[in-house]
Amino acid sequence: MSQQNQTEYLDFELPIAELEAKIESLRSVTDQDSKIDLDDEIKRLQKKTAELTKKTFADLDAWQVSRMARHPNRPYTLDYISRIFTEFEELAGDRAFADDKAIVGGLARLDGRPVMVIGHQKGRSVKEKVLRNFGMPAPEGYRKALRLMQMAERFRLPIITFIDTPGAYPGVGAEERGQSEAIARNLREMSTLTVPVICTVIGEGGSGGALAIGVGDKVNMLQYSTYSVISPEGCASILWKSAEKASTAAEVMGLTASRLKELELIDNIVTEPLGGAHRQYDEMAQALKQRILSDLEDLDILDKETLLDRRYQRLMNYGYV
């Protein structure tokens, strides 16, 4: 793995974890005594691990994909920003109430080209999770995002967004400060921006909280990300009065990238490294960068009127199959 976080495993990954633990154990033996040659056994186990990983991830069901989208080691927005962009300068505050740490954004360069990048940001440690409010923005977060988008429009900069949220924060304070209005305003204003907008779901795409920075000319999803109006647990609690039916709900909700591509609600699926994005941050970031560059190339040739018409039609088509 290319990051420093200790790997965590989901239950369906445990057989893979056991093999990887054996490999590490053998390596520690050879490190302690160079006279012991275990290279052949290590190579055999590595081959077996690769085969098992490929088999496991070849046919994940919707519930397993949902859990992959929330994987604690999964790369977040700032992980991608540091690998895809240069000269990132974070901008803070909505100029009305506060700076919401659940949304990050600022100016950056993409292969030398100035852009505006915005995304949801979750935390890893308990302290950071609280600081980022578990990736659930309040109204001031969406107003900050809109402020940055309007700035990008003034300076004719493409806008790139990364979506990864369980949803907008549902607290009383957020509602009092106009959560629904902030989301609705973003939907309206994003549909009229006259610069290219590229959106990518990198983890969870939770309802209006995701859509509030997701109205774009190109909408992509990582292979093991999800996009839905409600979480599987929430859907199960409503329909079956039990969150234990979450796996059933996930199957019928059509929240996976492959299903949404079939419904023509997204443009592209970005393939993840074997075992998921959390196993190879750098490789995943490079694949996503190439997708963004390709999308920008496609959008650069379109005039403002075409951009606006296509984006508006996409928004109006949501909800129709």
UniProtKB/Swiss-Prot annotation:
GO terms for cellular component: acetyl-CoA carboxylase complex. Pathway: Lipid metabolism; malonyl-CoA biosynthesis; malonyl-CoA from acetyl-CoA: step 1/1. It catalyses: N(6)-carboxybiotinyl-L-lysyl-[protein] + acetyl-CoA = N(6)-biotinyl-L-lysyl-[protein] + malonyl-CoA. Residues 37-298 form the CoA carboxyltransferase C-terminal domain. It comes from the Bacteria. Disulfide bonds: none annotated. It is found in: Cytoplasm. The keyword Hydrolase does not apply. Its EC number is 2.1.3.15. GO terms for molecular function: acetyl-CoA carboxylase activity; ATP binding; carboxyl- or carbamoyltransferase activity. InterPro entries: Acetyl_CoA_COase_a_su, ClpP/crotonase-like_dom_sf, COA_CT_C. Its main location: cytoplasm. Keywords: ATP-binding, Cytoplasm, Fatty acid biosynthesis, Fatty acid metabolism, Lipid biosynthesis, Lipid metabolism, Nucleotide-binding, Transferase. GO terms for biological process: fatty acid biosynthetic process; malonyl-CoA biosynthetic process. Belongs to the AccA family. NCBIfam families: accA, AccA_sub, PRK05724.1. Component of the acetyl coenzyme A carboxylase (ACC) complex. First, biotin carboxylase catalyzes the carboxylation of biotin on its carrier protein (BCCP) and then the CO(2) group is transferred by the carboxyltransferase to acetyl-CoA to form malonyl-CoA. PANTHER family: ACETYL-COENZYME A CARBOXYLASE CARBOXYL TRANSFERASE SUBUNIT ALPHA, ACETYL-COENZYME A CARBOXYLASE CARBOXYL TRANSFERASE SUBUNIT ALPHA, CHLOROPLASTIC. Acetyl-CoA carboxylase is a heterohexamer composed of biotin carboxyl carrier protein (AccB), biotin carboxylase (AccC) and two subunits each of ACCase subunit alpha (AccA) and ACCase subunit beta (AccD). This is Acetyl-coenzyme A carboxylase carboxyl transferase subunit alpha. It comes from Mannheimia succiniciproducens (strain KCTC 0769BP / MBEL55E). The lineage of its organism: Bacteria, Pseudomonadati, Pseudomonadota, Gammaproteobacteria, Pasteurellales.
